């Protein structure tokens, strides 16, 4: 058991931050999944807003320190390539 007040506070703060980070990651994964589903269906009208949403969520995760910037850049690049392939097809 912890003996210091600040340790108890930090445990609560870490648990809260972990929950928020999980929510952000989940929201981002959902946006990416929706974009991939739209790409697979071949719907060209809805692909741009879905891509913007996924890209925005990834950038927010980077700015909040949830994921690394290179990871986000790689995912955005791969999603963008899929979107371009759909638009040119």
Swiss-Prot record:
Annotated InterPro entries: Ribosomal_bS20, Ribosomal_bS20_sf
Keywords: Ribonucleoprotein, Ribosomal protein, RNA-binding, rRNA-binding
UniProt GO cellular component terms: cytosol; small ribosomal subunit
Domain of life from the UniProt record: Bacteria
Example of a GO MF term: small ribosomal subunit rRNA binding
Pfam families hit by this protein: Ribosomal_S20p
GO BP annotation list: translation
Record function comment: Binds directly to 16S ribosomal RNA.
Family: Belongs to the bacterial ribosomal protein bS20 family.
HAMAP family linked: Ribosomal_bS20 (MF_00500)
Protein name: Small ribosomal subunit protein bS20
Organism from which the protein derives: Wolbachia sp. subsp. Brugia malayi (strain TRS)
Name of the encoding gene: rpsT
